[in-house]
């Protein structure tokens, strides 16, 4: 049985219930079972570390993945969704080092690798429960039970296989390179890792002198921001083609050499120095200089402490003289190698250990952390007279992505994968991938690939997949292992785990007769593992070989833009190297989520709300929709604002929920009042003649087509705004314009058609929105599905909305002409609303006229066809349509598009702009028709000029109008006040107050109430308004409206006093309807005879319980009251003809059709008595003339709108009802007989009231 929908909803609480429902029915796994035989859609999930809690970046990427994979399932695919965990590498080790106070390799050696890795393993899944809880709570369907972890032996074995493939292809080598080095983690990083975390920092800025051996009074001046590298200086480098100068420092009396372009870096005024000589840098080549320190003086034997030349030196900063520390700078290393200052087999001049501290060679600073040693080195240079100037320099500098500490550049031996020879193939494969947004492929990722460098894949660490190379001591003999079986065979040992503690001790016999081969000490960079994820997660090629190859490359992946230098890159490098093809076909790249102030989100700064608290407060659907409906899905940044999530709930989810609630309310009303059970069957729904039904159905089908196209193109950022717009269309337009139809005010048949339309649209919208808002759509669907005719389901499994396939576009329902017509109507209404807002005239107050001016007659015809909606929505009496601008003083005005024309016309723009503004109305009309115009010699088109209407209020007697326009239409609204309209506005205010009280009591429309009122105003104004608008108020509130007092027997629901335009109004709602309808049984009549059609009412008894009609009497009364002469009448209820034996009282409240011919066509049946009426209550006399009732009913009109009752007629008819024609009567509005009904009381104010009949005594009675 369909459930009533509460007015108030806690979205988070309802989502928790949906989670229980999914869990109880194992919906996700069932979903996978159902789709097992469908075509596969392959999705790779990038593995996060579980050593930290999920943040908004994870939530965003997870939401994108969930939306696309849900969509793929609903599009007819089978989608395996396995969660993955990155378990190795620096993030884990760094946490352990901090916890255990480990400073370097010596501490690990003392502990032992086995114990160290045991500690790492223990925290790998530290936050896995929180991850699972948050991901599940967000509504993401992903398989945690069948996850993959990079620490699984099967995963690690596949990583070995990947590496061996590369090794066998000659893509692996060992080299010594200057690399980014994390002193906090004690390991080198790859170039793409070092590019992930740049910060602006202040470093020392020092100018140091290097006296020439040939002339110690002349010094080269070098500049550096890393004083700690100066103890390792082996050379200086200049640019051979730049002009250098020898100058005399006036103050110091010394001679210095530097580039002429950088003199300003040292001297503020030219008078501070004298240029003695100019020469190219090439002339400095080979000159010897005095070293700063003697730590590596032996290197002088190999040509150290010499001036070298290279074009990498620039004169844009520094002095044009660069100090060379070849083991701490990549360019330094290359140049010194070129000039044989160092050789491949040289002992490295690298006096810095893995912790970033000076080793014993640097005796003055041994044990000092290099950055801390800067100030001490500067002090020593000053003492030695080698410091020319010192300050600070702000620049962007790389930090370790894990420890957030500054990196240094340091030469270390590492294992590399050759990437540089692959660049062309990488670019080619990148072009085969579809990127959303496109610019990421071309710009960010493409540019990165063009500059790709060989990848350092080894880390001098412990917790990771060991590099499977067994080597001789001299590294001449190398065996690369590609599987567990291979290692077991070569080592003769059974293996159960592949971590260092399990295999480091294993040796392999040498084929060359050398000592047994031992494994190299390094482990893989964890990015190598995640890049191997497509193969390793399925243990390829050891298992699932066919399945993997059939499903590779992946159909879809998604991550943040930072992964262009991370996971996206490593995936592409490995897939290109292994298979020569890209690893994925489609990729969505999201931007970064920042704090509301634009800064990076920081736990330390606490500058963002906790994601769990946001979900608990607003729900996951609101958070999901907020993130997806933002620039972040276009790879732009998003400043996260809590109020944005709140607004999604308020502006999208609540209105959508209320439309659904309104639908359910009216399904209940239909069943209760009309005894019609609503069941939807899309195969038997009749085409509605109502234009708004056709419009909203067409709009939905157009949306479906757009949804299919854009989702297939992975453009979520275009889909969500359209879905959100449709919620607005549905709630603020369709439901609003059809409230009366949906509430049954236009008859049962039309009500059912409107409900069918709304049901169809609600269900389709739920199916489209299901991937985006999985909870709310499930909540609605669980109730809506109970209204689907089982005969139409065709054995589909309908337990969850997420089992349903997406609806297909029904082209036959698309009606673009109707969509355009309604769009034009909406524009008119919106323009009218702007005018009302501008003049602060509430919509409750009716206005006389709206004039719509449009140059397109077809547009005006469209607007004419929807005129009644304009009248209702803008509350106007009359709509006037015209193409005559001049009649109303309307002229055209032009505004240039500054951006478009300014860019195109440049210097000529100003003159063209002025000329555009001077164009006459006639010229602009010609431009409006032709679409082009020549201004100042430039041909301009529609995209260059914006036309607007202007309104001259003083022209042509139009002073009563206010105007507003858009590009196509201008609307004039007559805002002149009119008393009858003001009165109606007051009546609407009364209705508004009553409905608000209803809402306060959480009443639904089918709850029966009585409304009592007490109005206090000057001259009884408010009383008069209420009395004269009683019918209007009742038609809206569907409840009896009575003046005070409130009977003591009534059950009061709520009572409230309010102010209304200076009047006091007290309203009381009581439970139950004090006037449930006519006291006597009745039927509504629809009479079709003699070529005319009439409506009216017949009372089947009067007074109650007496004077009952049979069929013969009914026909006689019809002939008399409705003037039907000379016709043989037949009476029908629906399609069934009434027979003589029919009990007419059983048909009370129904509508009968009286015809002089065949069975009538179906008619709508009003839910209340068709004519106005009042009830009679006899107070103090027994009925006469054998009549037994004391309660009766009088019709104030019959037929409908005819034969209105007068006061005299009321007295006469009351006496007639009770057989008291010979008695004098007095009539009262209350039982206490204090409010007598006199001739000056309008009869229409008595509608639906009870009139109390008092019989005056006769002489005989006395």
Curated annotation (Swiss-Prot):
Q: What are the EC numbers?
A: 6.1.1.5
Residues where Phosphothreonine is found = 1058
Position of motif 'HIGH' region? 48-58
Tell me where it resides: Cytoplasm; Cytoplasm, Cytosol
**Which Gene Ontology terms cover its molecular function?**
aminoacyl-tRNA deacylase activity; ATP binding; GTPase binding; isoleucine-tRNA ligase activity; tRNA binding
| Binding residues annotated for ATP, in chain numbering | 603
Q: Which Pfam families match?
A: Anticodon_1 (PF08264), DUF5915 (PF19302), tRNA-synt_1 (PF00133), Ubiquitin_IARS1 (PF23567)
> Which processes are annotated in GO (biological process)?
isoleucyl-tRNA aminoacylation
Q: Which UniProt keywords apply?
A: Acetylation, Aminoacyl-tRNA synthetase, ATP-binding, Cytoplasm, Ligase, Nucleotide-binding, Phosphoprotein, Protein biosynthesis
- Signal peptide from the UniProt entry: none
The cross-references to Gene3D superfamilies, in alphabetical order and at most eight, read: HUPs, Isoleucyl-tRNA Synthetase, Domain 1
* Primary location: cytoplasm
Map motif 'KMSKS' region onto the chain: 600-604
Q: Which InterPro entries match?
A: aa-tRNA-synth_I_CS (IPR001412), aa-tRNA-synth_Ia (IPR002300), Anticodon_Ile_ABEc (IPR033709), Ile-tRNA-ligase (IPR002301), Ile-tRNA-ligase_type2 (IPR023586), M/V/L/I-tRNA-synth_anticd-bd (IPR013155), Rossmann-like_a/b/a_fold (IPR014729), tRNAsynth_Ia_anticodon-bd (IPR009080)
Q: Which reaction does it catalyse?
A: tRNA(Ile) + L-isoleucine + ATP = L-isoleucyl-tRNA(Ile) + AMP + diphosphate
- Extract one GO cellular component term from the record: aminoacyl-tRNA synthetase multienzyme complex
Where are the N-acetylmethionine modifications?
1
Residues that the record marks as modified (Phosphoserine) are: 1049
* Cited function: Catalyzes the specific attachment of an amino acid to its cognate tRNA in a 2 step reaction: the amino acid (AA) is first activated by ATP to form AA-AMP and then transferred to the acceptor end of the tRNA.
Cite the record's note on assembly.
Part of a multisubunit complex that groups tRNA ligases for Arg (RARS1), Asp (DARS1), Gln (QARS1), Ile (IARS1), Leu (LARS1), Lys (KARS1), Met (MARS1) the bifunctional ligase for Glu and Pro (EPRS1) and the auxiliary subunits AIMP1/p43, AIMP2/p38 and EEF1E1/p18.
Family affiliation:
Belongs to the class-I aminoacyl-tRNA synthetase family.
Protein name per its UniProtKB record:
Isoleucine--tRNA ligase, cytoplasmic
Per the UniProt record, the source organism is Mus musculus
Q: What is the lineage of its organism?
A: Eukaryota, Metazoa, Chordata, Craniata, Vertebrata
